[in-house]
Design a protein with these regions (language model features):
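Glycine-rich, positively charged N-terminal anion/phosphate-binding segment
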Residues: 2-8, 23-102
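Alpha/beta enzyme core
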Residues: 34-39, 90-121, 129-207, 223
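Short, solvent-exposed helix-helix connector turns and helix-capping sites enriched
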Residues: 60-64, 128-129, 242, 335
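Active-site beta-loop-alpha junctions enriched in small/polar residues
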Residues: 23-25, 52-54, 82-84, 110-112, ...
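Short, electropositive, low-hydrophobicity segments enriched in small/polar residues
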Residues: 29, 87, 114, 126, ...
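Short glycine-enriched, charge-decorated loop/helix-capping segments at active-site entrances
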Residues: 64-66, 120-126
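Alpha/beta catalytic cores of nucleotide-metabolism and tRNA/nucleoside-modifying enzymes
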Residues: 1-10, 14, 18-19, 134, ...
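Hydrophobic faces of well-ordered beta-strands that scaffold small-molecule active sites
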Residues: 18-22, 47-50, 77-81, 105, ...
Length: 365
């Protein structure tokens, strides 16, 4: 299979068409680095943070706040910011570029949650195309990094017309790539993602277009690339359950296997994927304790790390045939050691059997 990224992402640095979506509570350093282990040798793709509030970033400790913790070996990090005021945005992007090591800045204009809407962040910016473009301009005034924007769909024919006008305004203001989740704010995760809007946006707007929505397998990713002609595909929760999708796509494209997996083939059957998920789930848990060390972080508690891991299982577990049972057992863990014993016993204990991974699950919760 072939796919060429003909419009530059991160000014040409990106050569791989699959990327992780920024997700609250999920795209933190521990999960991010565990997923990165499946990236093929030679592949370059952007890596997100959780959503970062531009009002808080100027005063936050980057070595203490969980949303901005990073590993020194990470590269091509693109933090996603929420914001609509120039001074907080100015201070935030300067710190992210000069102190944190960002490779780009992503502006969230697609988040439909009430907390973002109450501050006129996220998808609420799509209610005012002129001001949304100004948010991009004010960001561009204070950073030399490439700027991307994540947005949602318009509703109906008039909504599509608005989406195109809105998107062109963002590009004129300085956005170098756009990611479209083709569901409206009202839909949230319900209904079917309208991939046709991705195709039309790619035809009408002259920058890299990244598609997002209803991708659960590498086959889905290939179908989106083919049907919409988008430059790349952004995958959310499915990549937290099936991170070797990166490996599968890389294998299809002729990339070498990930570091440490030389000579191996990407898991493809449900049983192979189930076994790989077991390894991955334990890796995520181990990385939580490595990158979020409780003893060194005064306001980090063991209970918080346990909640983070349970949240990972809640989002990734639905693809596992008995993921509900794993989640239930994890909910009874009273310490990190207890949690590690529980997860290890579930997958590799004397009563354990291979837990297959299903191809798809209902994502509309």
């Amino acid at each position: 299979m072939k796919h060429e990224i003909t419009r530059p992402i991160l000014r040409g640095a990106v050569n791989f068409p699959i990327m992780l979506a920024p997700m609250v509570g999920l795209s933190h350093v521990s999960l991010r680095t565990a997923i990165r282990e499946y990236l093929p040798v030679g592949a370059v793709t952007p890596w997100p943070t959780e959503m970062l509030n531009s009002r808080r970033l100027p005063i936050e400790r980057f070595d203490l706040v969980p949303e901005v913790l990073r590993c020194e070996t990470e590269s091509h990090l693109v933090p996603q910011i929420l914001g609509n005021e120039e001074e907080p945005i100015r201070k935030s992007v300067i710190r992210l570029e000069n102190e944190w090591g960002a490779s780009g800045i992503d502006i969230n204009m697609g988040c439909p949650v009430k907390k973002a809407l109450s501050h006129n962040y996220g998808v609420s910016l799509m209610g005012d195309s002129d001001y949304a473009a100004e948010v991009v301009r004010m960001t561009a005034r204070h950073t030399k990094l490439p700027i991307s924007v994540k947005l949602r769909a318009g509703k109906g024919e008039s909504g599509l017309e608005f989406l195109l006008k809105f998107s062109k305004g963002l590009v004129e203001a300085g956005a170098e790539s756009l990611t479209l989740h083709p569901r409206s704010a009202e839909q949230k995760r319900r209904g079917k993602a309208d991939w046709d809007q991705i195709r039309i946006l790619r035809e009408e707007v002259p920058v890299a277009i990244i598609g997002n929505g209803d991708v659960q397998t590498s086959g889905d990713a290939w179908r989106m690339l083919k049907e919409t002609k988008c430059d790349a595909v952004m995958v959310g929760r499915a990549l937290t359950a099936r991170p070797w999708m990166l490996w599968q796509i890389g294998e299809d494209l002729g990339f070498q296997a990930p570091v440490g997996r030389e000579g191996e083939k990407a898991p493809r059957t449900s049983e192979e994927e189930g076994l790989e998920f077991a390894r991955f789930a334990l890796n995520v848990l181990n990385r939580l304790t490595v990158y979020h060390p409780v003893k060194e972080k005064a306001h980090w508690s063991e209970a918080l790390l346990i909640r983070k891991y349970r949240f990972f299982l809640k989002n990734a577990g639905p693809w596992l045939y008995f993921g509900h049972e794993l989640e239930a057992r994890a909910s009874r863990a009273t310490s990190l050691d207890h949690l590690k014993e529980t997860v290890n016993d579930f997958f590799f204990g004397p009563q354990a059997t291979v837990q297959p991974l299903s191809e798809r699950t209902d994502l509309r919760y």
